[in-house]
Design a protein with these regions (language model features):
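Basic/polar, cationic surfaces and motifs that engage anionic cell-wall
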Residues: 22-54, 147-223
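N-terminal secretory signal peptides that target proteins for export/translocation
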Residues: 1-4
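Glycine-rich, often proline-containing surface loops adjacent to acidic residues and nearby aromatics
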Residues: 135-143
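Solvent-exposed, acidic/flexible segments
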Residues: 70-72, 101, 132-134, 147-158
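A cross-domain feature marking catalytic cores of carbohydrate-active enzymes
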Residues: 81, 110, 143, 178-180
Length: 223
């Protein structure tokens, strides 16, 4: 999602239409990737959450975007990139809280150092497809593109966060999708190839899979 060119126009839908859209999410295609040839290091959910360094900085429930929200049990995780070379996670949190994004919002912004949570996970955001199934059924994660940050560190932190959310909500790896999946948009641009999922997206999914396996691996029993 390009946060420098955000529309403030809201689309208001009746509840039956929203519920219908929620059930109409198509099944994503399977992503082919090479499994990381590294033994998974066992982590608990709390350990990996600490590694992600999640900070809550919620928008006001009275904000324009949150007033239009609906309750949600997430079935997808949608990955975006900010297309903002200057704004880190804290800057995006401030922008959301002062209403600079209009009717748009999402659940997390991730940068090199932290992941900032903007809204509750049981609440819809407006980040994927203007009130369609992507908004109604997915957690939105924006990956920062700060010029002075190491992008690989940001991507790995995002992969860890994704793995934690997958386990928390029993979301299959197949349902971790780029913004491109919902609208064909070139987003997250740094992880797409010629505007489409390719080898870079497969690499990211392999990292998510690795951290997922870390959460599912039991520590070796003491001898």
């Amino acid at each position: 999602m390009n946060v420098r060119m955000l529309s403030a126009n809201a689309v208001f839908l009746m509840l039956p239409a929203l519920l219908a859209a929620c059930s109409d999410a198509p099944r994503p295609p399977a992503v082919s990737f090479r499994i990381q040839n590294v033994p998974p290091v066992p982590r608990t959910m709390s350990q990996m959450s600490r590694e992600v360094h999640i900070n809550r900085d919620f928008m006001s429930p009275r904000s324009r975007a949150r007033r239009a929200a609906h309750s949600m049990h997430p079935r997808f995780i949608t990955i975006h990139s900010t297309a903002n070379p200057k704004g880190d996670a804290a800057a995006h949190a401030r922008a959301l809280k002062r209403g600079a994004m209009g009717s748009l919002n999402w659940h997390f912004t991730v940068d090199q150092y932290r992941a900032v949570q903007h809204i509750p996970l049981n609440e819809t955001g407006r980040h994927a497809d203007r009130g369609g199934p992507g908004d109604m059924s997915s957690i939105g994660i924006e990956m920062g593109e700060v010029r002075s940050h190491n992008p690989v560190v940001t991507w790995n932190r995002s992969a860890k966060l994704t793995a934690v959310l997958m386990k928390q909500y029993h979301i299959p790896l197949r349902n971790v999708v780029p913004h491109y999946y919902w609208t064909g948009k070139n987003c997250p641009a740094p992880l797409l190839t010629n505007g489409r999922p390719g080898h870079k997206w497969s690499w990211f999914i392999s990292r998510v899979d690795y951290y997922r396996r870390c959460l599912e691996t039991r520590p070796a029993a003491a001898v």
